[in-house]
Amino acid sequence: MTQEDIKDMMLYGERINLEYKEAFNELPKSFWETYSSFANTIGGQIVLGIKEHRTKMTMQERFEIQGVNNAAKILKTLWDTVNSDKVSRNILLDENVETIDYDGKQLIVVTIPMANYTERPIY
C-alpha cells in the first residue's frame, strides 16, 4: 500500500470493511472489537494513525493524518496481544500488517482476513 492508496481511501471515509483509528501513542482498545467484527464477516482494513473529527462534514476535514508515535511499540503490542488469550484466535500473518510513510508520518495498515467458518467466532 502506498501514500496514494491512503489518499484515495480517505476520499470516501470509513466503510463496512475500512476503519481509521487514532493510535498516536498506543494501540487503541477499540482495535480488538473491529478485529473481531472484520474477522467474523468479510474481512477489512484498519488504518492506525488517522484521527476522525466527527463534527466535520467533508472527508478532507473529517480525517486527519496524525501518524503513530512509535510504530515498533504499537506493533509489539498488536502481535503480543493477538497471540495471547485476549483474542480467541490469531488469523493475521506478517504480510497482513504493514507500516506506511505518509508525508513523514508513520501509519500502520492491518488487513484482517475473513475467518474460515471453522475458526469462527473470533472474539
Regions found by a protein language model. Give the residues of each.
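Conserved N-terminal catalytic/coupling substructures associated with nucleotide/phosphate chemistry
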Residues: 1-123
